Each structure stands twice: as C-alpha cells, then as structure tokens.
Design a protein with these regions (language model features):
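Defense-system signaling and execution modules centered on TIR/cGAS-STING-like, death/scaffold domains
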Residues: 1, 80-122
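Eukaryotic helical DNA- and histone-tail-recognition domains of regulatory proteins
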Residues: 4-30
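Short helix/loop segment immediately N-terminal to the Walker
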Residues: 24-31, 164-170
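Short alpha-helical "recognition helix" segments of helix-turn-helix
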Residues: 35-40
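Major-groove recognition helix of helix-turn-helix-like DNA-binding domains
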Residues: 45-61
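Short Lys/Arg-enriched helix C-cap and helix-to-coil transition segments
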Residues: 62-81
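Short, charged surface segments at domain edges that flank catalytic/cofactor-binding sites
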Residues: 108-171
Length: 173
C-alpha cells in the first residue's frame, strides 16, 4: 500500500463524506464507522486511515468557510496539494466553479509552520486573476509573514484583528 492516496481513493472518500454531510445537515442518523468500513473493503487502507482522511476533508470544508460534520473535527495535517485535490473534488461533485481557497490557505499555514524564515521577496507586480472583477493573486509566503507580524492585532487601530477562524490559525480575510 502506498502512502500517497490515488485520485480514486480521494474521490471515494469525498463522495462518502458528502453523503454523510448531507445526512448530518438533514438530521438523519448514520454511523461514520460504516462508511469507513465500506471504503476499507474497497481499498487497501484501514478504517482509521479513512477516519483521518474524513477529518482532512472537514479541514478543507472549514478552509472553504463551510460547515463540516460534527464529530469529524478538522485535522490540519494535509498538504496543500492534497487539500487542493479534495477541494476540486468537492466543487466538481457539488457543481461549483473551481477555486483555490483550500490550497492557498494550506500554503499560508505551511509557511507559518516554518521555524526560521526570512522575509519573503513578494512580487511588486502580482498577476491578476479574473473573477466577477479583478483581484491580485496573493503570495502565501507574504500573507504568512504579515499575519505573523500582526500577531493577531490590526496595525491601524491596535485592536484585536478580525482574521481568526475557528481552527486556531489565521486566515487572510
């Protein structure tokens, strides 16, 4: 068994998560372990592996600003590449447009975890991306650096800054 998850394994895990989430939001009863067992029967991974992966999926939902399944608290140990894959699968399954919220947030978090780092170079002419309007593409290294310098406080008014999210790490909002 490879440590790396195949796209088929990730898609099956996200599909199971979305079904559980629908039941959770509708107030229907379900047993998470039944889903883990069904997945473990299909793929060469343990039920515990699928439980952890479901918590990674909760983390991606939280990064996207969406509600996750109670009892599957977000587990932040997921790389930005896998977070991006999970986000893409969620968006595809739900018919949503592609986004890179989870990948960017995960990259910021990874930069913040580095013990010693120099100020990032940044980009004096950042590229723009088209959405409903235009916005600059942010450098996750710069965002992480600024968040660390701010230390939870607004640089303009010195009040506690409003960029905290519920998973104990800041976001760039």
């Amino acid at each position: 068994m490879s440590d790396n998850w195949t796209s088929e394994e990730l898609e099956a895990a996200v599909e199971a998560y979305l079904e559980m989430r629908r039941k959770f939001l509708d107030g229907e009863d379900f047993r998470r372990v039944d889903y883990y067992r069904a997945l473990a029967d299909r793929f060469p991974r343990s039920t515990k592996s699928f439980e952890y992966r479901m918590q990674n999926i909760s983390y991606v939902f939280a990064l996207m600003g969406r509600r996750w399944i109670k009892g599957l608290a977000p587990l932040t140990h997921v790389g930005s590449k896998v977070a991006s894959q999970i986000e893409a699968i969620i968006n595809k399954r739900e018919g949503r447009p592609p986004s890179q919220i989870a990948e960017f947030s995960s990259s910021v978090s990874n930069y913040q975890k580095k013990k010693k780092r120099l100020p990032p170079e940044g980009n004096r002419t950042p590229p723009k991306t088209k959405t409903g309007g235009s916005q600059f593409v942010r450098d996750p290294g710069v965002v992480a650096w600024v968040l660390d310098l701010a230390n939870g406080f607004c640089e303009c008014c010195n009040k506690e800054a409003p960029f905290q999210i519920s998973m104990e790490h800041p976001t760039w909002k």
